[in-house]
């Protein structure tokens, strides 16, 4: 393993989209009370990819990925690989359609985290490095102080945000019906140690989200960008 892969994000106990191998943080409120400020971002429906000085990685960091849907990202990496140093950029690769089709994508890769050795960088630093390498970040939904927050208020806010359509427009790939966003990711707005990841990042996923199967990689489809949708309408 060249570098450590992205940690497993635990679900909120009220997240309905858990699967058999998912983990739930039943003591999430104890963790959140140790955090000063939370940032809630949209959970995008794609593949977790990492850009580091050693290559482009998918979930496994045993070896760089060579999948066809990362070709464009690997070409981009060639341009920035010598400038990354110890910084590892993590983002959602939306090049291939999964269980949600987005209609307003301006690009296919959105940054959600950055790591430097044993430290996960603050949200401000994530945005700084994303901008430095001319990469967009995932949609920021809300930043809020934990002071005055209660478990019930947090739950209501997370569920409310999860029931909205995606920032980039979301529909079911097969029926083309408008659907809600995949979910919401909450994280400590500050920096924290890699070993403390599970106590600083939490997620909520919509019920029955995953609709792809083991044959997905054989029949994958490229996600159109917004200007391609616009061209289709004009024609």
Model-predicted regions and their roles:
Residues 1-235:
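Core nucleotide-handling region used for phosphoryl-transfer chemistry
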């Amino acid at each position: 393993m060249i570098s450590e892969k992205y940690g497993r994000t635990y679900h909120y106990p009220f997240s309905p989209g858990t699967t058999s191998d998912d983990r739930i943080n039943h003591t999430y409120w104890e963790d959140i009370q140790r955090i000063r400020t939370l940032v809630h971002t949209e959970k995008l429906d794609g593949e977790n990819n990492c850009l580091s000085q050693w290559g482009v990685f998918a979930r496994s960091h045993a070896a760089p990925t060579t999948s066809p849907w990362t070709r464009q990202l690997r070409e981009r990496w060639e341009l920035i690989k010598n400038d990354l140093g110890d910084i590892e950029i993590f983002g959602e690769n939306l090049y291939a359609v999964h269980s949600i089709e987005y209609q307003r994508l301006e690009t296919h890769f959105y940054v959600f985290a950055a790591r430097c050795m044993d430290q996960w960088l603050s949200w401000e630093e994530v945005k700084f490095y994303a901008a430095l390498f001319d990469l967009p970040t995932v949609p920021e939904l809300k930043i809020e102080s934990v002071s005055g927050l209660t478990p019930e208020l947090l739950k209501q806010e997370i569920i409310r945000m999860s029931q909205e359509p995606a920032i980039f427009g979301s529909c079911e790939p097969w029926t083309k019906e408008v659907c809600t966003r995949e979910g919401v990711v909450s994280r400590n707005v500050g920096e924290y140690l890699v070993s403390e990841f599970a106590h600083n990042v939490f997620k909520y996923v919509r019920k029955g989200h995953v609709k792809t199967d083991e044959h997905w990689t054989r029949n994958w489809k490229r996600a159109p960008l917004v200007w391609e949708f616009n061209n289709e309408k004009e024609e």
